[in-house]
A protein has these predicted regions:
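Helix-loop boundary and gating motifs at the non-cytosolic
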Residues: 2-62, 247-283
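C-terminal ends and interior cores of transmembrane alpha-helices
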Residues: 86-107, 329-339
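Intracellular loop-helix junctions on the cytosolic face of multi-pass helical membrane proteins
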Residues: 1-15, 106-113, 124-129, 136-262
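Hydrophobic core of transmembrane alpha-helices in multi-pass small-molecule transporters
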Residues: 25, 95-128, 132
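Juxtamembrane helix-start motifs in multi-pass secondary transporters
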Residues: 82, 86-88, 189, 320-326
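Loop-to-transmembrane helix entry
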Residues: 47-59, 147, 184-188, 277-302
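Helix-to-loop junctions at the C-terminal end of transmembrane segments
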Residues: 65-82, 306-320
Length: 339
C-alpha cells in the first residue's frame, strides 16, 4: 500500500526494483533444488519407484492449501514490520533450516517430513511476495516489477540445477557420498540454497522496506474480520466469482501440472536407465544421470526465459490460444521421446 493510496507510491529506480526482487532468487533456487534432487534423495534413502508420487505430495498439497490461506491472512495483517515482511522472514528461516537438514536426513520419513516443511515455508514466503510488488510499486512500474521477478525465477532455477555440475567442474568428486549415499555435491548445493534463501530475503527486506500504511488504510484493515474462518470464506468467494476464462485455464493446468510432476519425479530414473543402463541408486551411472538432469534443467530454464520473450510478438500475430496449444504439443512430444 502506498503512503497516500495507489496514486502516491514513489517511483523506484531499476536498481531498487531489482533489490526488492532479489528475495525471489532464493525462493526459486530452493524450488529448483527440490525439482532436481528430491527423487534421487528418496532413492538414496531406500524409496522404491512406485512410492515417489506419494513422497512428492508435499509440493502440490502445500501449494493448494498454504498459498491462498497465507495470501488472505497477509491482507489482514498489521504488524510493526508491515503486512508482508513477517511472512517473508518466517518462511525464509524455516526454508533455510529445512534445506540445511535435508541432505543429512537419517531416514526416508525424515526427508519426506522436511519436504513438507520446505514447501510450506516456500509458499509462505512466495505468496505475499507477489502482493509486495503490487503494494510497493506504482501501477506504471508493476509490469517491470513482475518481469524482474520472472528474471530472478529463471536465474534461481537455472543456477540451482547447474550447481552440482559446477561443483564437479571446480574439482569436487561426483562420486563421493555420505553415510546415507547422498553425494557431497548435493549436500553442498542444499547448504548453498539455505544461505541464498535467508540472505536474499534479508537483502530485499532491508533495501526495500514496505511503505507505511496511512491511518485510513490501517483502520480499514483493522476492521476486517480476523481468523482463519473469514480468510477461508474470502477464498471461497474468489473461487465462486472466478472468471470463465480462468475456469477454462484451470482444466488445462490440471493436466499440465500432472505432466510436470511426472517429469520431475521420474526424469533422473529415466535418464539412468536410458543412458547408463542402471536403476541402482548407489551406482555411478545413477549419480551421473543426476548431473545430466541438472544440465538439462538449467538448459530448459534458459530456453524458457528466451521463449517467454520471443512469444510476445508471436502471440500478437497468431493469438494466445494457438501459441499455447503449439507449446503444449511440443512439450508433450518432448516428454514422449525423453524415456
Amino acid at each position: 500500500m502506498g503512503e497516500g493510496g495507489t496514486g502516491t507510491r514513489p517511483r523506484l529506480s531499476l536498481a531498487q526494483i531489482v533489490n526488492m526482487n532479489v528475495g525471489f532468487f532464493g525462493i526459486q533456487y530452493s524450488f529448483g533444488l527440490q525439482q532436481g534432487n528430491m527423487s534421487p534423495i528418496y532413492r538414496y534413502l531406500g524409496a522404491d519407484e512406485a512410492t515417489l508420487p506419494l513422497l512428492w505430495l508435499a509440493g502440490p498439497m502445500t501449494g493448494l492449501l498454504v498459498q491462498p490461506v497465507v495470501g488472505a491472512l497477509s491482507d489482514r495483517t498489521l504488524s510493526p514490520r508491515g503486512r508482508r515482511t513477517p511472512y517473508f522472514l518466517v518462511g525464509a528461516v524455516l526454508c533455510s533450516l529445512a534445506l540445511l537438514a535435508m541432505p543429512f536426513s537419517p531416514a526416508l520419513w525424515a526427508a519426506a517430513g522436511l519436504l513438507w516443511i520446505l514447501d510450506a515455508a516456500n509458499n509462505v514466503t512466495m505468496e505475499p511476495y507477489r502482493a509486495y510488488v503490487t503494494d510497493r510499486l506504482a501501477p506504471a512500474q508493476q509490469a517491470q516489477g513482475f518481469l524482474t521477478q520472472s528474471a530472478f525465477t529463471g536465474l534461481g532455477q537455472t543456477l540451482s540445477y547447474l550447481t552440482p555440475s559446477l561443483l564437479v567442474g571446480l574439482g569436487m568428486s561426483g562420486d563421493a557420498v555420505n553415510a546415507r549415499g547422498i553425494p557431497h555435491i548435493t549436500t553442498l548445493a542444499f547448504l548453498l540454497g539455505a544461505v541464498f534463501s535467508i540472505t536474499s530475503i534479508l537483502w530485499s527486506v532491508r533495501t526495500t522496506p514496505e511503505l507505511p500504511l496511512t491511518a485510513a488504510e490501517r483502520a480499514r484493515i483493522a476492521a476486517l474480520p480476523r481468523g482463519m474462518g473469514p480468510a477461508l470464506r474470502e477464498i471461497a468467494d474468489a473461487m465462486r466469482d472466478m472468471p470463465a476464462t480462468m475456469r477454462q485455464l484451470a482444466v488445462m493446468k490440471l493436466f499440465q501440472w500432472y505432466a510436470m510432476f511426472c517429469y520431475w519425479q521420474y526424469v533422473v530414473l529415466a535418464l539412468a536407465r536410458t543412458l547408463y543402463g542402471t536403476s541402482d541408486p548407489q551406482s555411478a551411472g545413477f549419480r551421473e544421470a543426476g548431473l545430466v538432469n541438472g544440465q538439462l534443467g538449467g538448459f530448459y530454464n534458459f530456453v524458457a526465459f528466451l521463449s517467454a520473450l520471443a512469444m510476445v510478438p508471436v502471440t500478437r500475430r497468431f493469438g494466445a490460444r494457438w501459441v499455447h496449444a503449439a507449446a503444449l504439443t511440443a512439450a508433450g512430444v518432448g516428454m514422449w521421446m525423453l524415456p
